[in-house]
Amino acid sequence: MQALLFISCGAILGASLRWAIGLLFNPLFSSFAFGALIANLLGCLIIGVLLGLFWQFPQISAEWRLFLITGFLGSLTTFSSFSSEVVELFFNDKWLNGFCVLMMHLFGCLAMTVLGIWIYKICSQLLS
């Protein structure tokens, strides 16, 4: 039951941030939901940093992992929103836009995760 509380608290914060990012960035582009891309890229960057942290300090409690990764990042990033946006573009015969959104999410998120790991490694070396 305690694990559910940690996940839920993290999810409240992640979902709230995702909503705020959507409000801020979605009006910038009419062709696709830019907020979802920003949320996914940011979430992947953060998870990269957290992976580096958890790898270096495996003694960090499982509660923090549940709160940050499962709860916060699980609700900040979402594959279902991304999928629906791409499919909607394809169904509206906006093939180029759909393909571009698909590639930006896929490669952008992978790159941000690696960047997050590198950022963590550099920061941990500078601080030690």
Curated annotation (Swiss-Prot):
Record family assignment: Belongs to the fluoride channel Fluc/FEX (TC 1.A.43) family.
Protein name (database record): Fluoride-specific ion channel FluC
Species name: Haemophilus influenzae (strain PittEE)
GO MF term (any one): fluoride channel activity
Entry function: Fluoride-specific ion channel. Important for reducing fluoride concentration in the cell, thus reducing its toxicity.
Localization of this protein: Cell inner membrane
Catalytic activity of the protein: fluoride(in) = fluoride(out)
Keyword Transport: yes
Binding of Na(+), residues: G74, T77
